[in-house]
């Protein structure tokens, strides 16, 4: 159904742990090179099923190429790796909002596309075999409260709240685009 190419990009000028900038740079390069679909995943993902790329493309095509899809993994709450079409760039102008540094970037795209444009492929599985993060949450060495669980929980709650607010604002862009291109 499709040709697949993996792009490896290394830019040491991007601060360690600011994953969203890295994904935005890669997404822009692939978009400018006229790729139609994009899969964002970490280097600790192990694909357990075959055919997920074609199924992801078929799913998005059946939904006017608007939305988020991909294999599920060991996080049953959200998709933690994402498959989108070129329309994601046309809608937002980036892969991730620059306000998000690392944690909650996957929460954001689930929040922004849910419920109308989120299509998990439950027949495909891609396990996340990673260990502890190799970066500071939100690029903040003090985010975890130096072991104080109350501070850590409060910081997580605030980060998820700000992510939800951002997603609520960005949802309007999807509807605007969708209505314009009916």
Regions found by a protein language model. Name each.
Residues 101-182:
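C-terminal catalytic/acceptor-binding lobe
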Residues 19, 27, 39-40, 45-114:
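Conserved catalytic core of nucleotide-sugar-dependent glycosyltransferases
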Residues 15, 40, 65-68, 125, ...:
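Intrinsically disordered, low-complexity segments enriched in small/polar residues
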Residues 1-9, 61-67, 115-119:
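Structural alpha-beta junctions
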Residues 10, 70-72, 122:
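Residue-level recognition of beta-strand->loop/alpha-helix junctions
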Residues 3-4, 11, 48-53, 64-65, ...:
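Intrinsic low-complexity, intrinsically disordered segments enriched in polar/basic residues
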Residues 13-17, 73-75, 125:
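Residue-level detector of flexible, active-site-proximal loop/helix-junction positions
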Residues 1-35:
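Active-site-proximal specificity loops/subdomain of glycosyltransferases
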